[in-house]
């Protein structure tokens, strides 16, 4: 597998050959807190003068190495080329017209400039707090709790009808996301605005390992019985955390509605 130094040299040399105006990198490789491993992508942008000329003949992409798989994506005025190479490295390369550089900057939480002789990035600053969580207001908390318990009824319906994809989608995509949000707010109460990462990937760094194990145990959706078990455990987890959060902040928690919704689920699924 090519080293980071080799890959960055290749990225910069290719940019030089193509007469790219500026090069920057975003993603986990620009975050000192991110764990270092072989799965970190090279999220790179080439700021270019002539986008149409570059995409007219993409043979130059071969210079990055032999690809296992690739994907091309159109993003507003930009072109994104996702490439996984045989040696395990991956480059997510964005081609961005110079006049639309702000479009790329606004799409990224943080970035590091690798080459910018014209100073094109000078007017722009990274916004690393994009995935940070601030302390919740009482309205935020109330809306989150209402969303959790309301959508839990959809999960009950899906399980009862044996519509398992529907049930799982609402359980993980809504209820468990509200649980993760609540856990992030728990941290923010003590620490202020905190970096939980995209998709909460750093959240459990702020908790004892048992908390992550408790959440991970919810993620078996392989059959109807296990989805049902996950729903009840998710309800218990959320109810426990919401009460603790309410006690800590003084925010009102509608415990009566929560317990009625748990009874509703028990009556229909037990």
Q: What are these language model-derived features?
A:
Residues 42, 64, 114-117, 186-188, ...:
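Surface-exposed loop/turn and secondary-structure junction residues enriched for glycine/proline
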Residues 35, 128, 199:
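Glycine-rich, flexible loop/turn motifs
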Residues 1-21, 26-39, 44-94, 99-101:
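Metal-dependent nucleotidyltransferase catalytic core
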Residues 38, 110-113, 202:
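Residue-level preference for alpha-helix termini and adjacent loops
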Residues 36-37, 105-107, 196:
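Short aromatic-enriched loop/helix-cap "lid" or pocket-rim segments at secondary-structure transitions
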Residues 132, 136-270:
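Conserved nucleotidyltransferase catalytic core and NTase-mimicking acidic/glycine-rich helix/loop elements
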Residues 7-8, 20, 55-57, 127-132, ...:
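Short amphipathic alpha-helical segments, especially helix-boundary/capping motifs
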């Amino acid at each position: 597998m090519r080293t980071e130094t080799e890959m960055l040299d290749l990225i910069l040399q290719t940019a030089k050959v193509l007469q790219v105006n500026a090069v920057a990198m975003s993603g986990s490789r620009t975050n000192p807190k991110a764990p270092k491993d072989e799965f970190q992508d090279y999220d790179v942008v080439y700021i270019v003068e002539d986008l149409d000329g570059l995409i007219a003949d993409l043979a130059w992409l071969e210079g990055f190495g032999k690809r296992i798989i690739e994907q091309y994506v159109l993003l507003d005025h930009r072109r994104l080329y996702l490439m996984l190479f045989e040696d395990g490295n991956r480059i997510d390369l964005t081609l961005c017209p110079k006049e639309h550089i702000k479009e790329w900057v606004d799409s990224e939480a943080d970035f590091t400039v690798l080459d910018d002789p014209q100073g094109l990035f000078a007017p722009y600053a990274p916004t690393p707090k994009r995935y940070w969580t601030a302390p919740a207001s009482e309205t935020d908390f109330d809306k989150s709790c209402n969303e959790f318990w309301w959508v839990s009824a959809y999960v009950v319906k899906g399980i009862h009808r044996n519509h398992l994809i529907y049930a799982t989608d609402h359980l993980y995509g809504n209820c468990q996301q509200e649980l993760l949000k609540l856990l992030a707010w728990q941290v923010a109460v003590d620490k202020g605005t905190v970096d939980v990462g995209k998709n909460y990937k750093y959240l459990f760094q702020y908790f004892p390992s048992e908390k992550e194990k408790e959440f991970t145990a919810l993620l078996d959706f392989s059959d109807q019985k296990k989805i049902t078990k996950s729903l009840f455990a998710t309800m218990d987890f959320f109810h426990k955390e919401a009460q603790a959060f309410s006690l800590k902040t003084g925010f009102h928690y509608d415990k009566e509605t929560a317990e009625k919704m748990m009874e509703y689920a028990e009556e229909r699924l037990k």
